[in-house]
Amino acid sequence: MIVHAYKYQGAGNDFVIFDNRNNEYDLTPEQIKLLCDRRFGIGADGMMLLGHSDEYDFSMRYFNADGYEGSMCGNDGRCLVAFAAHRGIKKFDFNAIDGFHTAEVLEFTPHRCIVKL
């Protein structure tokens, strides 16, 4: 199985992100923990899934480095919005475990994305 993972960082935190709008990835806590391990995996503070949503532009699932789902903080939300923009998404109303969020991309280049969350 080929896995397409992306690594984003913002304000000192780094994240592994998957585009899961087609529900391709169903990772276990053990797999997430291994991916986030800095010695044996990609290494990250957490992992996110950009998902499909019927009500919003997309959904967000965030997992801490221990493999378990957590709530959104600012840095992960900004990184996911930047990832969504790089994947061609133009509107940024999304739901996460802690509810509805909206964001605005203020600046967008291939290597930099400034997000208001």
Give residue ranges: language-model regions:
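A glycine-rich beta-to-alpha transition motif near the start of alpha/beta enzyme domains, typified by
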Residues: 1-112
